[in-house]
């Protein structure tokens, strides 16, 4: 078939790509391109009226994002198989699940890939929290059978994700040797409530889509 050019301007929506492709009669081609920062104009002029209006909202946003929400006594870091940041995030999800759904889950699961920044020691601002959690994920409450939950933990031997307190997982030689929730071995016939995010349920990487019930925030 015909060759189709596929181009990309990078990531995070920083640039707009502009490309010219020149074709002559014998099929030879040449091209030129440039990257245009999305915060600039083609003619480099700044509209004073728009800049004034944007400045007002920028100041309001800055005030909100710089608001101190809490204090972190020690830095929260990512880690594998477990890190303090991921464990804190998963434990926080347990508390949030109680507020949002009125249910205390048996465990909470988040994903390392979704934690995009670490939290240093000191004051924690709203901006810090958005840096850690930049995605618009929904909190999801699932009910899984013990059999499906065991399948999930089997996959954790390869792709470890942060878990809430109360989960003990022993992995050796790439395989799960033992797992317990709340100090008890998992009963394959029992049902467990898991708090997670919609992304992990729909990613297809785990058995979370085998849930018997689901609620989204």
Where are these regions (language model features)?
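Feature captures C-terminal
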Residues: 3-4, 15, 87-217
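Hard-cation-handling environments
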Residues: 37-124
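Short Gly/Pro-enriched turn/cap motifs at secondary-structure boundaries
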Residues: 8-12, 82-84, 130
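Active-site-adjacent helix-turn-beta-strand microarchitecture at beta-sheet edges
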Residues: 1-64, 156, 160-163, 170-179
């Amino acid at each position: 078939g015909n060759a189709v050019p596929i181009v990309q301007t990078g990531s995070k929506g920083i640039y707009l790509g502009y490309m010219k492709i020149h074709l002559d009669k014998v099929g030879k081609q040449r091209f030129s391109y440039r990257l245009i920062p999305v915060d600039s104009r083609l003619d480099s002029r700044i509209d004073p009226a728009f800049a004034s209006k944007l400045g007002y909202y920028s100041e309001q946003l800055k005030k909100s994002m710089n608001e101190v929400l809490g204090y972190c006594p020690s830095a929260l870091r990512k880690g594998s198989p477990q890190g303090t940041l991921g464990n804190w995030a998963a434990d926080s999800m347990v508390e949030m699940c109680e507020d949002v759904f009125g249910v205390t889950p048996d465990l909470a699961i988040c994903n390392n890939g979704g934690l995009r920044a670490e939290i240093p020691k000191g004051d924690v601002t709203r901006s810090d929290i958005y840096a850690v959690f930049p995605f618009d994920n929904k909190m999801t409450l699932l009910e899984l059978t013990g059999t499906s939950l065991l399948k999930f933990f089997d996959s954790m031997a390869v792709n470890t994700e942060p878990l809430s307190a109360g989960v003990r997982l022993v992995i050796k030689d790439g395989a799960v040797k033992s797992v317990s929730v709340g100090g008890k071995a998992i009963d394959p016939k029992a049902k467990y409530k898991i708090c997670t995010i919609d992304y992990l349920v729909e990613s297809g990487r785990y058995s979370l889509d085998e849930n018997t019930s689901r609620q989204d925030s």
